[in-house]
Amino acid sequence: MGSLPTAVSEFMRICFITAFGGKPLNDNLERLANEFTNQGWTIEHIDHASLEVLDGQLTGNDPNGIRHVLDQFDRIWVVGFGDQPTFLDRMQLLRTLDQSKFVNNVDALIYLHGKPHLVLGDLGQHHPQTIVSANPQTLLSAVERGGAWIGKPTAGSFGRDVFTLTKTNSNRRAIIEHLTQSGFAMLQERVETTVEKRFLIAGSQLIGVYGKSHTDHRSNLAAGSVPTIVDATSAEIELVETCIRWLN
């Protein structure tokens, strides 16, 4: 992954590839753009849906309809995934660019966003029991054997479609059929926590940690969780360093 700015940088042009239109679910894009501007960068926003190959070059439109050649930027940051039906086509286009220019490169977006990949890798031992399937009966059978489970999409965001499931839920089949209607879903054994910790990593360095206090089974800020100030234990830092080595 590319580096982030820490001072006035020699990299002066960055484009944020994002979805135009609609109401944003958070202010991440605004915060990021403001910080790069403060560091002396020139900022452009490019619409996911506007990517086109013209005259042998990958291009995209800014909000004013001006078309930019993407390989002329010094840094590229993909913010959000855009429309699902065109995701793979857009990723194939972006993969032709120099990946060292990306803050979050294409391989990371494709292979590391989905949760099953982490479960099957070296970090799987640190996850709760997990079942992944596109077959509703496989997931339903696990729930009906007992225990408390969290059912969710394999690559969802913002706490959408996240459910607590036990064999006493009268609508357990309907929930699982809903989760699998478009493909794969996953069950994870529920782990009781009141404060979840999130660790921020950039450039292979741990740069911060914050907590999320939640009142139900969803710890996403978009679902009502509250960010809190927390400290990291030595054991947690050791685990984060293990994650960093795995990511590299």
Residue ranges of predicted features:
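Extreme N-terminal starter segment of soluble prokaryotic enzymes
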Residues: 11-15
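Phosphate-binding site of ATP-dependent enzymes
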Residues: 146-147, 158-247
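Rossmann-like NAD(P)H-binding beta-loop-alpha module
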Residues: 127-146
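Structural motif
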Residues: 75-77, 150, 186
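Conserved N-proximal alpha/beta basic substrate-recognition cap immediately N-terminal to
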Residues: 20-132
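Ala/Thr-enriched low-complexity intrinsically disordered regions
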Residues: 6-7
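Short acidic/polar capping segments at secondary-structure boundaries
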Residues: 107-110, 134-138, 154-158, 168-170, ...
